[in-house]
């Protein structure tokens, strides 16, 4: 089976109802892995999944918690994912 994410694009003003994930480094570059749930209050649409990109229209209340130590990412060819590396 092919290991891939299926991307969808949504447009309009959505409200972030949940956002969770982590910011690590892979190959010396920042690596974001975010999961989002967002709601379109005018059309009753809920979208959820991996967040690849977004534009904040006004504000977003996002808190970042810094952990002690270093956490990175490494590619695991066997399962086809970039795994956390402590």
Regions found by a protein language model. Give the residues of each.
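N-terminal intrinsically disordered, cationic/polar leader segments
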Residues: 1-32, 37-86
